[in-house]
Amino acid sequence: MKLQYSYSFFRGAALCGVALLSFLNCSSTSSDLSNNDNPGNGGGTGTGDPVQVWLTKGDQSIKLQQQGNAVFSGASGTGTTIEVDASQLFQTVDGFGYTLTGGSVQVINQLSTAKKQELLNDLFSSSGIGISYLRISIGASDLNSEVFTYNDLPSGQTDANLSQFSLTKDQAVVQMLKDILAINPNIKILATPWTAPVWMKDNGNSIGGSLKPEYYSVYAKYFVKYIQAMQAEGIKIDAITPQNEPLHPGNNPSMYMTAGDQATFIKAHLGPAFQAANINTKIIAYDHNCDNPAYPLAVLNDPAANPFVDGSAFHLYAGDISALGTVHNLFPNKNVYFTEQWTSSTGNFSGDLDWHVKNVIIGSMRNWSRNALEWNVANDASFGPHTPGGCTQCKGAVTITGAAGYDKNVAYYIIAHASKFVPANSQRIASTQGDNLSTVAFKTPQGKTVLIVQNSNTGDKAFNIKYNQKTASVTMPGVSTATYIF
């Protein structure tokens, strides 16, 4: 995760085209999320059929509450029209979620047993917001209370056989993943290291430095041992990236890895090691900002690395979300993923909601991403824990306020507007957009159509949703997010 970028910069990044639409009649039958009755399974598309509406307003007066239904009619409507076309099919969705950092686990475990179970159900169950994808760190991230890997040694020692490899320092994470899998056994997990063990690095430090070439094969075995150890705990690692933010060596922990080095590591060491161990965990390249699509393209253009690589992962602390589409268009047989974006303790709810829904949710999906992840799940009231030099302003989806409570932050609602209504294996379909209405649409495995709309206008916006020659006329409040299900 990036620490030092100015958050206001990101709001100015251009949104890669995206469309769809949304509505809202604020005649509220204001039902809380806990009153959800499987919103992805009801409705229809004939004249008189209802459109279910869920809304969050930037002023926080309404947060993920169901509103009065809109209704389809045979009339064409006038003014702005968002058209949804289910005949145009795009990528299948793996899921939406966050990174379950060690720090997140630490603070969630401070809740009472009952309150912790309530939170996990809220986040991961189908009656909650249904998070379907998690990222975890291999060893510590900068949002752990201490720096560690799974093979730390006294200074000057090495362990080429990895005889001292152990998950011991992550047992709390392992246990919470088991608790989460008990709620959603189908959740996908992406694992990423912030650094290799320092004895494998050319600077002997957790900050920066690079992997020594003589340890490439040992580090590949480190990944194999990790995946096998997690599998032994009943935790399947669906995918890995070789390095978090490989071009950001200033974080603690961190490690610098060029595109050439990553291609060499994958083609000559990691890929063959996975093959030899019969591991089918996906290898995803890059895992850094949208300003440098040349990095994943260099890895994918390597003819020996390419067969081992499932796709590329991106963050948006610099660049434009359209980078995902650029890479997809050049390698349409490879996947793209959006794996991290943080909200800041200095941000504001309205601005963060607007920028993140447009970019992280709508923008990434319209640019072929199979997932969309915000950063950490949870933090304490001081935006910790974090390592020395780690992020001091990262605001999680929830803030743990004590043993008895937690507060839901903007990142909770950013993800919830997708995760609650767009389950894994949904497929993106076509939608139009305009007049500061950003949209994306999906067809769920249950046959429902889901439309997510971000109204970036400061005032109310009336528009029409057109689907199968039927039209629903709706009005959406200024600076708000709506999800429509029909």
Kindly give the residue locations of the regions a language model identified:
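Bacterial Sec-dependent N-terminal signal peptides
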Residues: 2, 20-49
